[in-house]
A protein has these predicted regions:
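Residue-level signal for inorganic ion chemistry
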Residues: 34, 86, 123-125, 163, ...
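Short, conserved active-site entrance elements at the starts or edges of catalytic domains
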Residues: 193-216, 257
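Short amphipathic beta-strand starts and helix->beta connectors
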Residues: 8-17, 60-72, 104-107, 144-153, ...
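Acidic, proline/glycine-enriched N-terminal capping motif
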Residues: 1-70, 77-80
Length: 317
């Protein structure tokens, strides 16, 4: 059940002006350790894992051999040792775990699903670093912090700070953050900010038929100077010699819309709604990966109930 509009508006203001706290009970965490951990991931993921220094991180994707995404993730090196953490959306966890377990045979690498051992708490808003007790962190950088006596790893996020904490210390950390001035918000309110920023999410806009170029994540997630990785040929060919057939776009809806609804130009299907929300600032908006026929300025039909949407370039103006 969605929260009432008045409550969502208050949470939205909290996120924009102060700091909202959102827990992620279903987040994914894979721990990759061993002498060959970085070298192994270098050949599996799209970004330059071997260049990640202690306290740093990178955004990356796992592809199949045709260049389609199987998962996206933040790759962190939280300490001085070889251990790397992969923070994943729940939609990509199983595929990433299965793939990395399968291809590590014969290597000095251990891959472990630590999702049940640790919890993820997001602090979103301009006061996030202050409340976390962290210096402002560049996106994907990480550092150890103590919150209410709980040892955490703070990770720079697009809209604030994420805290990775041992599951049995989650409550202590959450209570300390609330006492410091954060306020609990819903996933629905946080989703509005994501949509407004034009950031795609795996399991919403992005899925197993999506290529990085279609989702607009190549600049952040792909290195063209590292060695080979699965799916590299397709990514490089599209980048240097081609154009994607689909692009991530914003949508401004004329009425209520829901994820999964088909989008059409005339009789031609051009995509499906990836996400939709009612923004206090922008109105009814959403994101979708659309075929070239639906360029910015075009109008698309949404579903079967007479709703339409204007296609807009991102970020929203």
């Amino acid at each position: 059940m969605s929260a009432p509009a008045v409550e969502i508006d208050a949470q939205y203001r909290q996120l924009r002006e102060e700091c909202g706290l959102l827990e992620h009970p279903d987040f994914g965490l894979l721990v990759v350790d061993g002498a060959e951990a970085a070298e192994y991931l270098q050949g599996q993921l799209t970004n330059d894992v071997e260049a990640i220094e202690p306290g740093d991180g990178a955004y990356a994707a796992l592809l199949d051999r045709k260049g389609h995404m199987q998962a996206d993730m933040r790759v962190l090196r939280p300490g001085e040792g070889p251990e790397l953490w992969l923070l994943l959306e729940p939609a990509g966890l199983a595929a990433a775990s299965r793939h990395l377990q399968m291809y590590k045979i014969g290597r000095e690498v251990e891959v472990r699903d630590a999702s049940e051992e640790r919890s993820l708490i997001s602090l979103i808003g301009p006061r996030a670093a202050e409340i976390a007790g962290s210096a402002p962190l560049p996106e994907n950088a990480c550092e150890a912090v103590t919150v209410g006596g709980a040892e955490c790893v703070a990770v720079g996020a697009a809209a604030g700070i994420d805290l990775v904490v041992l599951a049995d210390e989650r409550g202590r950390a959450r209570d300390a953050l609330l006492a410091a001035g954060a306020a609990e918000v819903s996933a629905e309110a946080a989703e509005i900010l994501r949509i407004e920023s034009g950031r795609p999410r795996f399991g919403a806009e992005m899925g197993t038929e999506t290529m990085p170029a279609e989702a607009g994540i190549v600049e952040q997630a792909v290195s063209f100077t590292k060695g080979c990785y699965i799916g590299q040929e397709t990514v490089a060919r599209l980048h240097y010699k081609g154009k994607p057939n689909r692009h991530l776009r914003g949508l401004r809806f004329s009425g209520q819309a829901a994820p999964g609804e088909v989008l059409r130009v005339g009789e031609k299907e051009v995509g499906t709604v990836g996400s939709a929300a009612v923004s206090p600032a922008l109105g009814r908006v959403g994101l979708a990966i659309l075929r070239r026929e639906a360029e910015p300025g075009a109008t698309v039909a949404v579903g079967e109930d007479g709703v339409t949407a204007e296609v807009v370039a991102l970020p929203f103006g």
